[in-house]
Structure formats: structure tokens, C-alpha cells
Amino acid sequence: MEQYHGTTIVSVRRGNQVALGGDGQVTLGNIVMKGTARKVRTIYDGKVLVGFAGATADAFSLLDRFEAKLQKYQGHLLRAAVDLAKDWRTDRALRHLEAMLIVADRESTLVITGNGDVLDPEGGIAAIGSGGAYAQSAAKALMENTELAPRDVVEKSLRIAGELCIYTNTNFVIETLE
């Protein structure tokens, strides 16, 4: 059976602000199943932003596990991410989950993959999903050539990705922390 997939998630950090946004499209094969999905949210009493790309059910499972790890480590983002990545890589059931997460708090942004990677992106920009490369390129250009706030960079980057990637639409959810 085909998986639901296709999305763009992008995060931008500048100064003491971070923004994380995603589009709303859920695709099954070559059919758009939903255009208003919410793949970005705040957790841990509004102190952590999280966005996910990949198979929807897998992403929700990982999101729940990440939130539990945050509780376990009292909001310490890196420790929670590393513990989740270890479980994801070593647990036989979790190993087959097909999703990626971007998580961010006031201090850091991390990309968590199913390969056990916890990546601290360079330049304050992270992007995942089918339109991730488009959004990341756009965000990099905007960060280097404008003084736009992170939220505006995220929105413009998602718009560009939505114009180029068939698995990305222009119904955005953007969350920020200051």
C-alpha cells in the first residue's frame, strides 16, 4: 500500500527569533488527499516548535515519542533528540518509520532523521521534505540578501517551494518563538 507523503518544512533562525513553517498538502501517490494538514505545531507548553515530513502516521508516532522525551529530559532539546534518534535507530519497530522532524527551541534547531542522525543545521536554516531543497535555497538567499524577520523568510521560502514542488501547496502554518 502506498504511503501518504510529500511536504515542505522549513525553519529559520535570526537573532533571538526562530520560525518554523510547513505547507498543508498530503499526497497519496499522485493524488492530493488533503490540502490543509497541520504539520507544524508547538509542544512543551509552547516552548518547542516541531515540524514533520514523511509518512503521516509515522510522523505522528515520532512526534508523540519526542514529546515524551522532552518531558523526561525536562525540556532539554538536544538530550531528547539524541535519545529519540537512538531509539529510532535501534528499535526494530521504530526502525521502519519513514519520517523526519525539525525541532526548535529558543537556543537551537535540530533535524532528526531515522538514520539516527541529529543535525544542527548551518546558518540557522533547516528544511526537510519533498520541497525542502527549494525552501532551503530560497531561505538562504533571503537571509543573505535581506533583513526580513524569520517568519517572513519562512513564508516566502514556502511560497517558492510551493511554486516549484508538486507535493507542496501554499496553505501554510507558521509558528514562531521569540
Swiss-Prot record:
Na(+) binds at residues 162, 165, 168. Its EC number is 3.4.25.2. GO terms for biological process: proteolysis involved in protein catabolic process. Keywords: Allosteric enzyme, Cytoplasm, Hydrolase, Metal-binding, Protease, Sodium, Threonine protease. The active site is at residue 7. It is found in: Cytoplasm. It is an enzyme of class 3 (hydrolase). The keyword Cytoplasm applies. GO terms for cellular component: HslUV protease complex; proteasome core complex. Allosterically activated by HslU binding. It catalyses: ATP-dependent cleavage of peptide bonds with broad specificity. A double ring-shaped homohexamer of HslV is capped on each side by a ring-shaped HslU homohexamer. The assembly of the HslU/HslV complex is dependent on binding of ATP. NCBIfam families: ATP_dep_HslV, PRK05456.1. Belongs to the peptidase T1B family. HslV subfamily. This is ATP-dependent protease subunit HslV. It comes from Ralstonia nicotianae (strain ATCC BAA-1114 / GMI1000). The lineage of its organism: Bacteria, Pseudomonadati, Pseudomonadota, Betaproteobacteria, Burkholderiales. The gene is hslV.
